[in-house]
């Protein structure tokens, strides 16, 4: 059991070695005979409960004790009562319990914590009176070993060894006092020598106290304030040398000196940070209205006080964050010194320290504020929010607030919107998936051959087998021209040596019409004259030419949007064309193709003026033809009008074409190709270039034979393709690749949404 002592300063040596033994103070009846001693404890449990819980009975025996000239009997009575109270509750507690030291047991109520703080402040006030009275006599607290201070120091050592683990449980409320013994529970939270200021007793008021202060407590407070005013002058004079001695003794005795109420800030910070949920209103009820107290759990940094001041350190080299990082070294250097000085002197010194250390600590304050600002705001918000009863919103409460009609109306609107949103998300995901599949699988589109049906393949193969023999013709090079639509069938009479007769120029008109309506046409030879190959591939195999293949999207009324292969160095622009196939049988029309033009395709035979002549150089210079269309020229028949990109579709009878004048190409290898446009749906499909009327560029670079003889062609065979045409590249014309498929789907989705909005 710890040694107990009183707070009086009269008979110090007599009370120095007194040891308080038994549980009840009635054993010390001699003290009661001297006056002011505790009365005999009650004999029933209810009286015991009232004595230790009701504030009016708590200090009844020692209300006038603690004065400057208090007798040892008063000190003994106060010590005995404190001892009995602590022992009744089953633990050994020091006489002067640290004010506002949080207990490790988190189960206290707000009122009990507040009462504990009130009574601890009362004990601290009585203790301060004893110490201050000894200071006026010039006594050294460590050298004289006075009766009032020796048990106090032992009690403080006990507090240090236990690390502030004990907190009185027998108090209900607290009344703020002038001075408070504030001992830090956690040594890592505060540095030695922190200066703080307490508010006067007048400004302090208990917040939401369950009961009023007893008469004895009020009398004790009046005595405290009178004594403080009386000894204020002498205390200021004796404060400085005593403080120096205490600082020296702190290093030898391994105790930390705390100036006035310095440790209370650290304990309050840790207490609020750990127990903000248990005590959400502690900032109002459990803490005095101190001008330097930060609001709501500001731990680990210098916070701005309520009146604009700032907490300052007495030891400038030491920083609070450095102390927190070195808790072991600070544990051994702590010495508890009771607060000294009056209210006015404390405020003056605080202001002076504020001015001295403002420049030194400005950087630290700003840095620490930045580091802990978010955490502190969270602490404050937690404390303020959790003190309010949480709202439990249920559908019934909403119905009661807005009414049944509005509730069901809002519910239906929300459900409908969620349903629409679910459908939209499904459509968007489907669009993204389809776009990625289309963009990532061009080979599937080629192999599946979407442009040709099974029925069409059969008829095309028959047509090709009947026309395996073909006549080579001159075709423009890749640099200047590009393949376009040709007539879908090859006439039987196109042989190598002699031009056939007009009646052998091709198949029946029915077959031609069928091929024209199906939109299937053969691609032309884009090379100089070569001999025909009797082992030409059929239509199904001719999808892989040694050229670039472009998968062009074609919108068909029967098939919808399909990708059809198109061979050529450049994709068609503008209108959508029928499919193109390379490596087909070359087309060569005889010189007597007038009847063929009229009978087979129904093209009215135009006048044959200067453009129709014998094989040789043309009578007019070659006209440059745009690279997206190749003129097909017949030595004897006029070329049909070439449908260009500006005329995407011209409804015509089967095989009807507009006719233009002869269009020649200014190129190194003179050639001519007869070009026909046959539509699947009775339409003349257009090529992808602009009209040739806009591209007439006459050049007189010399006569070039546009109608060479067959023998000259056969005698001078040339490679059918240039060097850069030997490689085959499959290029798919798609809106976006697989990487941007989601963007395309998003645009489609937005267009769908806009259409729905317009419909609504």
Swiss-Prot record:
<feature type="region of interest" description="Disordered">
    <location>
        <begin position="144"/>
        <end position="169"/>
    </location>
</feature>
<feature type="compositionally biased region" description="Basic and acidic residues">
    <location>
        <begin position="108"/>
        <end position="120"/>
    </location>
</feature>
<dbReference type="GO" id="GO:0009908">
    <property type="term" value="P:flower development"/>
</dbReference>
<dbReference type="GO" id="GO:0048578">
    <property type="term" value="P:positive regulation of long-day photoperiodism, flowering"/>
</dbReference>
<feature type="region of interest" description="Disordered">
    <location>
        <begin position="285"/>
        <end position="346"/>
    </location>
</feature>
<feature type="compositionally biased region" description="Polar residues">
    <location>
        <begin position="94"/>
        <end position="107"/>
    </location>
</feature>
<dbReference type="InterPro" id="IPR039319">
    <property type="entry name" value="ELF3-like"/>
</dbReference>
<dbReference type="GO" id="GO:0048576">
    <property type="term" value="P:positive regulation of short-day photoperiodism, flowering"/>
</dbReference>
<keyword id="KW-0804">Transcription</keyword>
<feature type="region of interest" description="Disordered">
    <location>
        <begin position="1"/>
        <end position="120"/>
    </location>
</feature>
<feature type="region of interest" description="Disordered">
    <location>
        <begin position="485"/>
        <end position="543"/>
    </location>
</feature>
<comment type="function">
    <text>Involved in the regulation of flowering time under short day (SD) and long day (LD) conditions. Functions as a floral promoter by negatively regulating GHD7, a repressor of the photoperiodic control of flowering. Acts as a floral activator in the LD photoperiodic pathway. Involved in blue light-induced activation of EHD1 expression to promote flowering under SD conditions.</text>
</comment>
<feature type="compositionally biased region" description="Gly residues">
    <location>
        <begin position="1"/>
        <end position="12"/>
    </location>
</feature>
<feature type="compositionally biased region" description="Polar residues">
    <location>
        <begin position="511"/>
        <end position="522"/>
    </location>
</feature>
<protein>
    <recommendedName>
        <fullName>Protein HEADING DATE 3B</fullName>
    </recommendedName>
</protein>
<feature type="compositionally biased region" description="Gly residues">
    <location>
        <begin position="60"/>
        <end position="70"/>
    </location>
</feature>
<keyword id="KW-0539">Nucleus</keyword>
<feature type="region of interest" description="Disordered">
    <location>
        <begin position="707"/>
        <end position="760"/>
    </location>
</feature>
<feature type="compositionally biased region" description="Polar residues">
    <location>
        <begin position="707"/>
        <end position="730"/>
    </location>
</feature>
<dbReference type="GO" id="GO:0005634">
    <property type="term" value="C:nucleus"/>
</dbReference>
<feature type="compositionally biased region" description="Polar residues">
    <location>
        <begin position="531"/>
        <end position="543"/>
    </location>
</feature>
<feature type="compositionally biased region" description="Low complexity">
    <location>
        <begin position="71"/>
        <end position="87"/>
    </location>
</feature>
<keyword id="KW-0805">Transcription regulation</keyword>
<feature type="short sequence motif" description="Nuclear localization signal">
    <location>
        <begin position="349"/>
        <end position="355"/>
    </location>
</feature>
<feature type="region of interest" description="Disordered">
    <location>
        <begin position="236"/>
        <end position="262"/>
    </location>
</feature>
<keyword id="KW-0287">Flowering</keyword>
<feature type="compositionally biased region" description="Basic and acidic residues">
    <location>
        <begin position="236"/>
        <end position="248"/>
    </location>
</feature>
